[in-house]
Amino acid sequence: MALLRRLFYRKPPDRLLEIADRVYVFDCCFSTETMEQFEYKNYLDNIVLQLREQFVDSSLMVFNFRDEGKSLVSGLFSLYGITVKDYPCQYLGCPLLPLEMVLHFLRLSERWLMLEGQQNFLLMHCEKGGWPVLAFMLAGLLLYMKQYNGEERTLVMVYKQAPKELLQMLTTLNPQPSHLRYLQYICKMDDELEWPIQPIPFTLDCVILREVPNFDGVGGCRPIVRVYGQDFLTVDKRCNVMLPPSKPRKHARRYKQQADNISVKLNVGSCVQGDVVLECLHIDDSLEDERLMFRVMFNTYFIQSHILPLNFENIDVSWDAEQRFTKKFKAEVLFSEFDGESDASIEVASDYDDEVEVGSIDVFFEAVEIFSNLDSQEGQRDAEILSITSTECSPRAELMKTAPFSHFDMEIGLGGSQKNKIDGMVLSLEKSDEKCTSAEGDIIQNNITRVVRSSSANTTDGDRDTMNSSCYGGKVDGCIVEKNNSNKEILTDSNEDSGIENVLVKEVIISETNSLKDIQMIKEVIISEVTTSKPVIEVDTIGTELSDVVHNSETITHAEANNEEEVLVTLKQNEGDNLVEECIYYGNSIMIKPEKYRKKEKSIIGSTIGVVPDSTEENSRVGLLLSVKPHLDSTGTYHDLNSPLQKIDLLNVSNTNCVEEQTKGMEASISNSYGQPSNLSSLNLQPQGSSFQANGDPTCANTSTDANESTQLELKRKSFLSLSTSSIFSPLSPRRNLLRSTSTDLSFLSPLQTKSNQHSIPCSSGRDDFASSYGPPPNIPCTSLRTSKVSSLVHPSLRPLRTVSSLSQSSFEEYLDISPPSPTFHEKHQQHFNLDPPSLIPPWQLRLAKTKENEIYPCTLSFLPLSPSNKYAHHPPFPPPPPPPHVLCTQNNSRTQISEYEQGRVEGPCPSSSYGQSILNSHDVSLSLPQKDSSCIAITNGPSSSNYVEEVPMETILNQPTLSIPLEACKDELLHCKENGGIPIPPPPPPLCDHAKKYTRIPLPPPPPEGSHGILATTSTELIDAGPQLPPLSHLEWKRCPHHPPERPHYLPGEVGGAPSPPSPPPPQRENTSVGIQGGIPPLPPPLPPTLGDYGVAPPPPSIGAGAPPPPPPPGGITGVPPPPPIGGLGGHQAPPAPPLPEGIGGVPPPPPVGGLGGPPAPPPPAGFRGGTPPPNAHGGVAPPPPPPRGHGGVGGPPTPPGAPAPPMPPGVPGGPPPPPGGRGLPAPPGGRGVVGHGLTRSLGLNSAATARRSTLKPLHWVKVTRAMHGSLWAEIQKQADANSHSEFDVKELESLFAIAPKTKGGSKSDGASKSLGSKPDKVHLIDLRRANNTEIMLTKIKMPLPDMMSAALALDDSVLDADQLENLIKFCPTKEEMELLKNYTGDKETLGKCEQFFLELMKVPRVESKFRIFAFKIQFQSQIRDVRKNLLTVSSACEELRGSEKLKVIMEKILFLGNKLNQGTPRGQALGFRLDSLLKLTDTRANNSRMTLMHFLCKGLADKSPHLLDFYEEFVNLEAASKLQLKALAEEQQAVVKGLQKVEQELAASESDGPVSEVFRKTLKEFTDASGADVRSLSALYAEVGKSADALAYYFGEDPAKCPFEQVTSTLLNFVGLFRKAHEENIKQIEADKKKAQKEAEKEANQDRTPVKSKDGLVDRSPRSPFK
């Protein structure tokens, strides 16, 4: 088996570590170095390429462990189509993951690796800091798949794969104990264990420390305990909060090791469930700094006997904490059963009630009762309690049902003393066939977006952050409830997309506003946007719940989850501690929460909340309107609600709008048109197909306009994903100018009329049907974006503006819903409003009503029909405003252009929901353009509110032309429109000339015909199948603004061509509205080219034929009103264009002065019905034709009176609007000429340049000298130049040699350019351009024709093609897809590119890639056989040399003797032999003088006694070469040769049926197989013999071949030989050094003995000399 394992072993790719079979780890995980992005990309590219090459048919999956944020790994691997699964690298600071996540990882890994029929691979990767959790997960995977046994052994093995310092560097505490605990959890689990597991809830009572650790330096500590984990009272498994500490810091007691022999008990009292992290911290004497003593992570599922015993071995401590803990340290974590009736946290709090700073004990326990015992609250309520049971239940509601206490009856206690049982208050959840598991619950609860909106207008950001940081948060079924010390409740939503953008934009507004006044005003602005940002969804099951009050806060939030949007509305009072109504939607249930405690009683008007379903099916849907009215009593008494629950009617509607009003200091006395009171309990809204209309108007009774006295909606700042706001807020943004300049006048929420006894009937038609035209209560006008919104009426001038380019579709939709202002209305005015007769809904609205929500284009402009009072029912229309004087003005370039689309709208759009199209109604709204400021457009009210003017800044930008209507959000719809005959979208208009931009202006529309009945009605110009403009409704009303006389005209520098948009034609009768669109909608015309003169030129009027396109709108959008639509539409005839303008006319007739000497140019003649006859207007007349213009820019005359014929414009009339002139090289329109006058075209210059003679010779690209300096060479040449100096050159020959080659096809340069642009390319490319280029580059290296190359390849001629060229050919063989592409090509194959020709040549040979590979194998076969045989012979020779060496045997015997001598009397003594790696330990055993080792001693002994053994290593000739070889690599090479020959034989058999094309190939290949077969067989036999010799060598030295393979044997012996030779050489050097030293000493002594010393008297002194003399 060991041989087979080595035989089939495949070396893993470089930079990967194989942990288990098909489980690899990137080696970058074991390093702390950080690679640059480019280097990291190359690192991954190389690994993936190697994996693709080695495992061609395998699939890869990457598990990445990382922190939060964007991961580079996912993006890189996605380029290769490799799946990446991201996991966090810590859980609450502990390098572990929750048990359920660990099980998910293990199950997924096992299924991936065990997938039948596939060989999948797992790649493990961790980003910086993720190695600890990756090591744990790897160990868990090995244990889970039964590849290893023993948790600690497996974990230590994985730890050792990385440097030891890496784990200490990444973690402050040693995570091994917690890792082992969770590995034991994994091993305890078997197949019968329920997964996912259901953790058992416990109450963590206390932590007992049996030994006191030393953390204060004097043998003691001051401990506290913190517990982190899932909040037990919520169902959100991701809501990980810090549970309350055992004691406050200031009450933590200090314990000593010796003085306190008793155990330390730290009370906790927290509810825990699932994965829990317990930390024990030491507080220093200053009570400020803390230090973590130990940490424990565990799961409550495995708690046994209500105790978790701990000791020093199974707690996470710091790496140097051994000195602080004794080895006898023990601790215990005690638990108790969780009791739902009494929360343990109450008991713990009561233990320290003297330490908690609260007002009183009663207040404390009352608050605890509210927050923790929701199932046992009972008492009185001030609001009506509604309970609706549905037969359907969503998975989220099913999940809610499994939550704690969800099946209990809800009882509310109010007042503490008096408690009344509410019989009907039961949270009912009907169970459906659909079951929601906890795993699905995780999916439901993913993507939680916590959008927090705060409370007070004067609250600073720091205060908000401080308040939010101290929150104790929990989440109940998608609705996060954060409870903080200030007794405020912040309700946030989950899974809301467009709401995020709204909050972000508002956050940016606040960040750019400096003063509190601006912040106050901004928060008023965003009331309607917050309340209309999300549609209210279908509610299947509605329950009620009453809870605590939240003072001084006002939040409106919306939630959406799992295709069922959940609405979370909290309406609260801003001033004082007033009664608060809360309506919370939990999944499919509604809980209405009134205030329990009030320090002082105040009366308010009840809030009314409207809820409408967003349905997705054709069956009946439920919409409900809740009328929540608190009984107002100034004495503070409560209204007992023991009466049965009030019913609410279910409505089959698609769009509603709910108008809310809050007024303080007064009792609500809201009446309908008949004076009936509004404190009624039920409401019935009539279904109206696709719209809601009302005969009443929302009013505001005694509404204060002071922002400080009004109810405010505040926004709490919270960080979100980044959004580009450069286009939203420029330094001179109109948003900021508007916010800083506009007053804070605000119309507040008006009460809802709630009494109706008529039952609603579903309506399937597209008309606005009413059950009663004059019912007692008026229905409420409702607007909608997609579906109904909870909306408030806000001062429209305070609404923030957005540029189209910076907003997404969802967020742009939310900006279009603008309610009409009604700040001056009173309730008495309601009697003047009657129901407007129903209007027909065009068929396009009916069709759009059935489209999906995401197909509706949001950019809709609607002018709402007025619902006039009886007094003004037949009031004639107001005269049109006079045009402004002709004054030129310029605009600042740095300002941001505001879409005229937004400037002109009075109400938000009315796009269809899933089943209806809403038509918006507003009351007394009219439009007026003249303003007191030149940059504003006024939108005024009707007669009832004529004193109110809304100003919208109209500032434009010059640098970038924009489309009139944003088109980015409707690409899919536009494609659909084109297929169904809809409109195409025009290209963007060309830019203006610099000198023409400053003269463009906006014309004013003309007055409509008489008899409009005072109703302002326009169509909703949506770009969905409807064309540029829809047939207008009957009437248009204009009102002059008396307070702001015009001062100067408004000029838009960005307007196309400087031409004013033509005025709107008179609309046809209403009965023709829906008929006029049946003939198809004409397409939008292309944009006008830029003008060339100094003054703009008016565009031509629409042609008389039906379906004539209107002129394009200006780039900035629609100025006030949409462009005029074509009136006809039934016919498809096209009229001839308007006659051109004669020469000399350079401008448009200027508008008449203010005095009224004429109006603006009248609209063009409308198209007729199938015959060109103009349709009659409301009075039966015809539309007025354009006035006869005056010559040379004169003032236009008055329009033709109604009834007059509409003669066409005769050609050549001065002053007529010409067609769009050509500009800067563009040809003029047909039949027209270029505009002559102030702005001349450059055509003359271009023509003169074109007529200039061009040289026919090739140019010499030199640097020209135009001025010869005095004294220079060129100056002298100029003086001496004469006519004969150039005669020596033959000019004709020069011209013939250097002439420009004539073009093969005639035509001028422009003709050639246009022809080359319009004609097809010479070569047709079917293959990817990059691959084609690489193929052509490769073919340049093969310098032979393609047929010759193929012949050489089929002949297996290695003299023509080498191995490198074949590798390139194999790499660029066509794939199956490319072959199919070329086979399906039916065109001329001669026109194909070189790459395609090459592929076609290869496709002529069957299985060409296989043949190339056979050819490459044949070329490399002999060299491969030779190399493998040589290496195998080297291994075999080395084995024979080692086994046959007698000298080595004697040396091993002597080493055995020395070892037994040293180990005599120890367990290691009396050994019969020793392991081979013990040879290397001879150098580790040193003598006393530290210069001699046992190896030196061995060499010395052998040199003295057996010198013939010292050269034993000379017998090992092949040892060094063999040590560099690996049998595994040789096995792969040998197997490659064998498999290669098998493929050769397979191809030989397959080529039998190829026919003549493979005849030569088959013959040559047959000869090759006959000769190579014997070589392969002999090689296999040699490999088998070598394998046996290698195993025999291991057995010879007493080793197991499986544990000590051949490579290890040879490397060990080679190292021993090196150490032996080194020691022997050192011994020789030492002996020589000793000899030299002894010789010197002997010579020195001899010299001293031979030298006599004479004394002073001449006698010889025999005594030795003193060294000091």
UniProtKB/Swiss-Prot annotation:
Listed Pfam families: FH2 (PF02181), PTEN_C2 (PF10409)
Active site: C126 (phosphocysteine intermediate)
Origin superkingdom: Eukaryota
Disordered: annotated segments: 688-709, 1025-1240, 1631-1669
Phosphatase tensin-type domain ranges (all copies): 5-193
All copies of domain C2 tensin-type, residue ranges: 199-338
Domain FH2: 1247-1646
Compositional bias (Basic and acidic residues): 1036-1050
GO molecular function: phosphoprotein phosphatase activity
Protein keywords: Hydrolase, Protein phosphatase
Bias type Pro residues, positions: 1060-1069, 1098-1127, 1136-1190, 1198-1230
Transmembrane segment boundaries: none
Family: Belongs to the formin-like family. Class-II subfamily.
Protein name: Formin-like protein 12
Organism: Oryza sativa subsp. japonica (Rice)
Classification lineage: Eukaryota, Viridiplantae, Streptophyta, Embryophyta, Tracheophyta
